[in-house]
Regions:
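C-terminal helical cap(s) of enzyme catalytic domains, especially alpha/beta-barrels
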Residues: 50, 97-121
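Generic structural signal for well-ordered alpha-helices
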Residues: 21, 50-54, 77-78, 108
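Glycine-rich phosphate-binding active-site loops on the catalytic face of alpha/beta enzymes
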Residues: 14, 30-42, 85-104
Protein backbone atom coordinates (compact mmCIF):
# COMPACT_ATOMS: atom_id res chain seq x y z
CA UNK A 1 0.00 0.00 0.00
CA UNK A 2 1.25 3.45 -0.91
CA UNK A 3 1.27 6.20 1.74
CA UNK A 4 -0.86 8.37 -0.52
CA UNK A 5 -3.52 5.64 -0.77
CA UNK A 6 -4.09 5.87 2.98
CA UNK A 7 -5.11 9.53 2.68
CA UNK A 8 -2.28 10.71 4.91
CA UNK A 9 -0.37 13.68 3.50
CA UNK A 10 3.24 13.00 4.39
CA UNK A 11 6.16 15.43 4.28
CA UNK A 12 9.49 13.64 3.99
CA UNK A 13 11.93 16.01 5.63
CA UNK A 14 15.73 16.14 5.81
CA UNK A 15 16.13 15.64 2.06
CA UNK A 16 19.77 16.14 1.05
CA UNK A 17 19.88 14.55 -2.40
CA UNK A 18 17.78 14.19 -5.52
CA UNK A 19 17.74 10.42 -5.06
CA UNK A 20 16.21 10.78 -1.58
CA UNK A 21 13.49 13.00 -3.04
CA UNK A 22 12.75 10.49 -5.79
CA UNK A 23 12.47 7.64 -3.28
CA UNK A 24 10.10 9.69 -1.12
CA UNK A 25 7.95 10.61 -4.11
CA UNK A 26 7.81 7.01 -5.29
CA UNK A 27 6.72 5.98 -1.78
CA UNK A 28 3.82 8.42 -2.11
CA UNK A 29 4.95 11.44 -0.12
CA UNK A 30 2.85 14.56 -0.70
CA UNK A 31 5.87 16.80 0.04
CA UNK A 32 9.65 16.53 0.11
CA UNK A 33 11.71 19.06 2.05
CA UNK A 34 15.25 19.66 0.83
CA UNK A 35 17.15 21.54 3.54
CA UNK A 36 18.82 24.27 1.50
CA UNK A 37 20.83 25.92 4.27
CA UNK A 38 22.15 22.66 5.65
CA UNK A 39 23.23 21.50 2.19
CA UNK A 40 25.05 24.82 1.78
CA UNK A 41 26.70 24.35 5.20
CA UNK A 42 28.13 20.99 4.20
CA UNK A 43 28.93 21.50 0.56
CA UNK A 44 27.25 23.92 -1.80
CA UNK A 45 24.28 24.15 -4.05
CA UNK A 46 21.28 23.86 -1.74
CA UNK A 47 19.17 25.83 -4.18
CA UNK A 48 20.52 23.75 -7.07
CA UNK A 49 19.18 20.71 -5.23
CA UNK A 50 15.71 22.31 -5.22
CA UNK A 51 16.09 22.99 -8.94
CA UNK A 52 17.19 19.42 -9.71
CA UNK A 53 14.35 17.87 -7.70
CA UNK A 54 11.71 20.15 -9.24
CA UNK A 55 13.04 19.44 -12.73
CA UNK A 56 12.86 15.67 -12.42
CA UNK A 57 9.41 15.87 -10.81
CA UNK A 58 8.14 18.03 -13.71
CA UNK A 59 9.72 15.83 -16.37
CA UNK A 60 8.13 12.72 -14.91
CA UNK A 61 4.84 14.39 -13.92
CA UNK A 62 5.34 13.58 -10.24
CA UNK A 63 2.67 15.19 -8.06
CA UNK A 64 4.90 15.39 -4.97
CA UNK A 65 5.49 19.03 -4.05
CA UNK A 66 8.89 20.53 -3.25
CA UNK A 67 8.98 22.33 0.10
CA UNK A 68 12.26 24.25 0.27
CA UNK A 69 13.32 24.37 3.92
CA UNK A 70 16.13 25.93 5.91
CA UNK A 71 16.14 29.11 3.82
CA UNK A 72 18.31 31.74 5.43
CA UNK A 73 17.90 34.85 3.33
CA UNK A 74 15.37 36.86 1.36
CA UNK A 75 17.15 36.07 -1.90
CA UNK A 76 16.94 32.36 -1.09
CA UNK A 77 13.14 32.58 -1.02
CA UNK A 78 12.90 34.17 -4.46
CA UNK A 79 15.43 31.77 -5.92
CA UNK A 80 13.67 28.75 -4.41
CA UNK A 81 10.46 29.68 -6.23
CA UNK A 82 12.41 30.55 -9.38
CA UNK A 83 13.97 27.08 -9.27
CA UNK A 84 10.63 25.31 -8.90
CA UNK A 85 9.79 25.09 -5.20
CA UNK A 86 6.07 24.87 -4.51
CA UNK A 87 6.32 25.92 -0.86
CA UNK A 88 9.01 27.46 1.34
CA UNK A 89 9.66 27.70 5.06
CA UNK A 90 11.72 30.47 6.59
CA UNK A 91 12.57 32.09 9.92
CA UNK A 92 10.58 35.15 10.98
CA UNK A 93 13.54 37.46 10.30
CA UNK A 94 13.62 36.36 6.65
CA UNK A 95 9.85 36.87 6.34
CA UNK A 96 10.18 40.36 7.81
CA UNK A 97 13.03 41.08 5.43
CA UNK A 98 10.76 40.25 2.52
CA UNK A 99 8.33 43.06 3.24
CA UNK A 100 10.70 45.59 4.79
CA UNK A 101 12.50 47.78 2.29
CA UNK A 102 14.11 51.18 2.73
CA UNK A 103 12.34 52.61 -0.33
CA UNK A 104 8.98 51.40 0.96
CA UNK A 105 9.67 53.06 4.32
CA UNK A 106 10.66 56.32 2.60
CA UNK A 107 7.59 56.17 0.38
CA UNK A 108 5.27 55.63 3.34
CA UNK A 109 6.86 58.56 5.18
CA UNK A 110 6.31 60.75 2.12
CA UNK A 111 2.68 59.61 1.81
CA UNK A 112 2.13 60.53 5.48
CA UNK A 113 3.67 63.98 4.93
CA UNK A 114 1.64 64.58 1.77
CA UNK A 115 -1.56 63.53 3.53
CA UNK A 116 -0.84 65.76 6.55
CA UNK A 117 -0.24 68.71 4.23
CA UNK A 118 -3.42 68.02 2.27
CA UNK A 119 -5.65 68.07 5.36
CA UNK A 120 -3.93 71.05 7.00
CA UNK A 121 -4.67 73.28 4.04
CA UNK A 122 -1.00 74.04 3.29
Amino acid sequence: MCIRDSGIRVNVTLIFSQSQAILAAKAGAKYVSPFVGRVDDNSFGGLCLVKDIAKVFREHMVSTEVLAASLRGVRDVGRAFEYGADIVTMPTKVFEGMYNHILTDKGLDQFDKDYAESISGV
